Amino acid sequence: MSANPMTEQVNRLIANRLAAGCELFLPGVGSLYVEQRGARRLDDERVVPPCRAVNFTTQEQGVSLIDEIVRAAHCDHEKAQSIYDRWLDSVVGERTLTISGVGELKGNRFNSDPEFEMVLNPYGFDPVRIRE
């Protein structure tokens, strides 16, 4: 986790909202959303179970993270904007945006942390044997 408590709190807010299936708009960045992927058959005897995955789009979708900060921190929009700006400055690196405990955005591709994938998919990804 980050050494900055404010950054940790915003990261946790993002994780909680995504785990709940919400879409989040990150102003100046784009939107994160959870996609449900269906089961797929590997062969006659095995199926990969359905899963949830975080995806990214440059379009504005869902609730603004600033509005979520207003609700969570019980503050006004101006203060929430300031928190968001400081958070964004702390998580943006060279061509990446890293949300500790959630994942990393490189270009237009979001890669979830393995631990967060298990939050979204507590039963894992191992193929399931089909009984007849």
Give a label for each model feature.
Residues 1-132:
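Strongly charged
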